[in-house]
A protein has these predicted regions:
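Contiguous, often N-terminal, cationic amphipathic patches that form binding interfaces
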Residues: 1-37, 41-44, 53-55, 59-75
Length: 75
């Protein structure tokens, strides 16, 4: 199990994906809007793909209504 800090960039016009930012934080670009948890669901999917894990092994711990989030990944 590891915890990952991520910054979510919803409504991305140019791409969708995960890049490693400064200090080991992830920057997650998603085309989904930050409405009704759609950006959170897309971020979970993209982080799971980035770490080659299943979606069920990625949990949002902190930051449900913020662009700064902490995810827990069970491997």
């Amino acid at each position: 199990m590891k915890q990952v800090f991520a910054v979510i960039k919803p409504n991305s016009k140019h791409r969708e994906g995960v890049i490693e930012g400064k200090g080991g934080a992830l920057v997650v670009y998603t085309k989904e809007p930050a409405i009704e948890g759609r950006a959170n669901a897309a971020a979970i999917k993209l982080i799971a793909e980035h770490f080659e894990a299943s979606r069920m092994s990625v949990n949002l711990i902190r930051g449900h209504a913020s662009k700064y989030k902490v995810f827990e990944i069970y491997e």
